[in-house]
């Protein structure tokens, strides 16, 4: 096992699995954090949602986080604490529950969960945002991260078992 510090570059909600990026040096952490801030680190997710969204979409919303409830809401007007959120998605498989692939342009707390739920497509297993099924946690997975590193794009991918079914 290698010794030394490890620096997480981004976060995932507690009940979300998938690809994470860590740095082994402070210099690498600074460079990767800059990629996140500048939007050159591309994060993609897969999710299983209730219902059938359109074939693809580009959604922008204003989100407000109520920290006392650890819940996020879509709101109509900008005010203190409101943040802009944007994502794009493609429906991969549609039906009563649909598989979608999502590209985040912003990384807001609970962003994917609340943006889909607010349009009537809560994530399967996401009881906080409207799912009424028997799954124990949201079917949401960080499946791909791409970022520039030393002149070339690095890409890391993984899929959950449920995305293949």
Language-model features and meaning:
Residues 100-103:
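Short histidine-centered loop motifs in beta-beta connectors
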Residues 109-165:
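Pseudouridine synthases involved in rRNA/tRNA modification
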Residues 1-86, 90-95, 139, 155, ...:
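RNA pseudouridine synthases
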């Amino acid at each position: 096992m290698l010794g030394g510090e490890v620096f997480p570059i981004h976060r995932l909600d507690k009940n979300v699995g998938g690809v994470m990026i860590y740095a082994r040096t402070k210099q690498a952490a600074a460079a990767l954090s800059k990629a996140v801030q500048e939007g050159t680190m591309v994060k993609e997710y897969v999710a299983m949602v209730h219902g059938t969204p359109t074939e693809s979409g580009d959604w922008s919303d204003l989100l407000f986080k109520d920290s006392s409830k650890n819940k996020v809401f879509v709101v109509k007007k900008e005010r203190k604490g409101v943040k802009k959120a944007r994502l794009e998605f493609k429906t991969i498989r549609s039906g009563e529950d649909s598989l979608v692939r999502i590209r985040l342009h912003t990384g807001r707390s609970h962003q994917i969960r609340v943006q889909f739920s607010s349009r009537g497509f809560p994530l399967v297993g996401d009881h906080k945002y409207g799912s009424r099924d028997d799954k124990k946690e949201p079917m949401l997975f960080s499946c791909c991260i791409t970022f520039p590193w030393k002149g070339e794009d690095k890409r890391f991918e993984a899929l959950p078992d449920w995305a293949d079914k």
